[in-house]
C-alpha cells in the first residue's frame, strides 16, 4: 500500500472512531457508506447535519437491519434510502437512527423487538411474520410467487391487503413495504456434482434447508435429500460436504461470503428471497396524521427504488461470484416447466398447505389470481 493510501486509511479510521466515540454512530455509518470517511470536511458536515436533524425532529425512529451499510450494492435492502426518504417526507419531524449489520439482532429477534416496541422499525424476512399470519407462508409454496414479478404483484394486491395485512396488524405490526430481492437459486458447492439443470441432477444431493416444512417437502419432491442446517452453520457445512447445495438468492450468497466455496448456480425461480420493513403499529398509530402520511409515502418511494435496484444488484453479485469461478445457468421455459411439474404448487401434495395457510381454497384462488395479475409495479426477473 503506498503512502497516500495509508494516509487515507488512517484518516478514515480516525474519523470513524471520532464520530462513533462522540455518540454519532449513525453519522459514522452514513459517511462510511458514502466512502467519505477520509475527508475531515465531509465527516464534520455529516456529523453536524445528523446532529441538527436529530435535535430538530419531534420523533425518533430506530431502524434495525441485519445488513451492513453498503450491502445494497448486491442485496437491495435500501436502508440508507429509507432513512433519507422518511426524514425528508416527514419534513424533518422524524429522525431515523440506523442500527445496521445485526447490531440489535436479525430475523425473528428483530421482528420480536418491533412487536414489543423496543424498536420502531426493522427489516426481516417475510417468513418471520408467519407465526402471526400463517397466510404469509404461502410465499414458500414453489412457483406460487417465485418470480420477482409474481411476488411484487401479490404483496401489492388488494387481495393481500385484505387477507394478510389485517392479521399482521392484529399482532401489533404495520408492514411499511415489502422488499424484492430476487428468487432463491440452486447453488452447488465446489467439489459437488456439477451444474443442476433438471430435477434429476439433484438425485442424492444433500440440500441445505431451513426449518420450513414446505421447503423441505419441495426439495424432496424434486429429488434432493433435504438436510436441515442452521443458517450460521451453513458455510462450514458446505465447505465440509455435510451439505452439497443451498438456496439463498445470488445477492445473499455474495453478502454472506459464499463466493469461494461454490461452483454452479442455477436460476430455478421457485421461491422468492422476500424481506419486509415492519413498524410497531401502536407507535405508528400514535403519530400525527401528516407524519403517518409522510412515512407511508417514504415507504412507497423506497419501494420504487428497491425494484429499480434489483437487476443492478444481481449483476454486481454475479460479477463478483464469476470472478471466483462460479458458473451461472438460466433455464428455458421448457426447462422451468420440468421443475414446476415435479414440485410446483399445482400438485395435490400442496393442497393441505393451501387450506391450512390461506384458510380455504377460495381464498387461495384469490391470492393465486393476484400473483398472476400484473399490478402497477414492474420488476426485472432473473
Regions found by a protein language model. Name each.
Residues 2-151, 174-382:
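N-terminal secretory/targeting leader peptides
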Amino acid at each position: 500500500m503506498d503512502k497516500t493510501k495509508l494516509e487515507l486509511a488512517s484518516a478514515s479510521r480516525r474519523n470513524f472512531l471520532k464520530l462513533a466515540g462522540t455518540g454519532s454512530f449513525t453519522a459514522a455509518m452514513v459517511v462510511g457508506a458514502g466512502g467519505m470517511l477520509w475527508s475531515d470536511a465531509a465527516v464534520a458536515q455529516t456529523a453536524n447535519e445528523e446532529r441538527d436533524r436529530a435535535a430538530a425532529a419531534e420523533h425518533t425512529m430506530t431502524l434495525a437491519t441485519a445488513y451492513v451499510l453498503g450491502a445494497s450494492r448486491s442485496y437491495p435492502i435500501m436502508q440508507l434510502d429509507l432513512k433519507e426518504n422518511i426524514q425528508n417526507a416527514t419534513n424533518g419531524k422524524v429522525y431515523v437512527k440506523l442500527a445496521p449489520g445485526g447490531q440489535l439482532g436479525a430475523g425473528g429477534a428483530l421482528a420480536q423487538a418491533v412487536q414489543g416496541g423496543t424498536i420502531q422499525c426493522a427489516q426481516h424476512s417475510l417468513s418471520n411474520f408467519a407465526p402471526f399470519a400463517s397466510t404469509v407462508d404461502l410465499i414458500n409454496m414453489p412457483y406460487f410467487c417465485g418470480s420477482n414479478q409474481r411476488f411484487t404483484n401479490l404483496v401489492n394486491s388488494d387481495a393481500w391487503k385484505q387477507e394478510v395485512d389485517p392479521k399482521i396488524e392484529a399482532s401489533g405490526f404495520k408492514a411499511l413495504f415489502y422488499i424484492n430481492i430476487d428468487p432463491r437459486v440452486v447453488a452447488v458447492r465446489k467439489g459437488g456434482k456439477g451444474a443442476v439443470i433438471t430435477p434429476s441432477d439433484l438425485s442424492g444431493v444433500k440440500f441445505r434447508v431451513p426449518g420450513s416444512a414446505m421447503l423441505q417437502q419441495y426439495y424432496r419432491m424434486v429429488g434432493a435429500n433435504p438436510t436441515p442446517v442452521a443458517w450460521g452453520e451453513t458455510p462450514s457445512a458446505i465447505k465440509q460436504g455435510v451439505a452439497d447445495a443451498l438456496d439463498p438468492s445470488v445477492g445473499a450468497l455474495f453478502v454472506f461470503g459464499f463466493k469461494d466455496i461454490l461452483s454452479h448456480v442455477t436460476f430455478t425461480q421457485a421461491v422468492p428471497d422476500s424481506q419486509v420493513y415492519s413498524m410497531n403499529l401502536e407507535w405508528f398509530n400514535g403519530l400525527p396524521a401528516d407524519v403517518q402520511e409522510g412515512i407511508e409515502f417514504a415507504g412507497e418511494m423506497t419501494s420504487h427504488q428497491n425494484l429499480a435496484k434489483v437487476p443492478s444488484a444481481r449483476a454486481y453479485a454475479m460479477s463478483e461470484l464469476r470472478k471466483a469461478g462460479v458458473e451461472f445457468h438460466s433455464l428455458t421455459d421448457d426447462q422451468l416447466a420440468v421443475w414446476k411439474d415435479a414440485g410446483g404448487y399445482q400438485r395435490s401434495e400442496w393442497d393441505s398447505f393451501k387450506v391450512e395457510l390461506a384458510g380455504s381454497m377460495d381464498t387461495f384462488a384469490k391470492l393465486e389470481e393476484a400473483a398472476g395479475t400484473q399490478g402497477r409495479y414492474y420488476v426485472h426477473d432473473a
